Amino acid sequence: MRPVVPRGVILLLFASLAVASSNLDWVDGLGGKIERDAAGNVIAVNLRGTWVSDSELLDLARLPKLERLDLSHTRITDEGMLYLKPATGIRELNLYYAEQITDQGMSAIKDWKNLKRLNVRGTRISDGTLAIAGGLTGLESLDVAYTEITDSGLDALVPLTHLKELSIGRSKLGGNELEVLRLLTTLEYLDLGGPHPGAGGKTETSVSPLPASVPCAISELKELRVLKLAYSGIGADGLRILSSLDKVEKLALEGCSHVNDQALTELAQWKSLKFLDVQETKVTPQGVAALEKARLGIVILSGDAGVVH
């Protein structure tokens, strides 16, 4: 005989769920946004750039259908992240420049097996978070640029056989990283670009030419469609090696001091190239015109003012 659940208990359960979903007036008060599905369940919360507190994240952890959470440019701490540990249904987490987050807080997501997209760019995470990410084998997009990760920590990413997008920044281009890159053959988007030399009060310095080992490693990623190498030492020789990437449609080379008209000549051989950013490089209007003639329909962003051709 099946046990009978009192009607009052059922009503209480539904009421508690309703309260969890509806008691989010503070999100609007902070200037955030909420998205619901057809049944009224909260499936996405955007708190980008708000003054959300750690304790307020407890309300979000109680949302059973929450899939997307944007906490970018907030001041939440590791304590707030740990409050989110029960939110295992989250598929997309954006912590872009949530600058107080470290590996300790990121331990909250180690059991989030549904997570597909993770952005921790500009946080204080290091190799511990890479190890956690490596255990989330369903990840499709990962941004760890401008963090404290090291070259050796990237080994943890090898199990990510579904990874399509990776951003790590140019500062981690060591030998170990190159070996890891060669194994990430599912990548369609790769960002190895560095920051603008003047960003964060830094003075402009010259960038050494990129060793041939770097483009050689990248050239093995045959599924790439977007490649970003901004403010790196890539030049004509490296672009010649990369011309074997016949699916790349978008190439970002802004601020690359070794990119000149000779480099543009090499790009004429790129079979699928549709968009090119060569702002703040040494290309000339004549070189740009020649590439446009060779690659009909290509969109080129050039010059210090970002002129579109």
Regions found by a protein language model. Give the residues of each.
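Short secondary-structure junctions
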Residues: 31-36, 299-301
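Short, surface-exposed alpha-helical segments at coil->helix boundaries
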Residues: 285-288
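Bacterial N-terminal signal peptides that target proteins for export
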Residues: 1-10
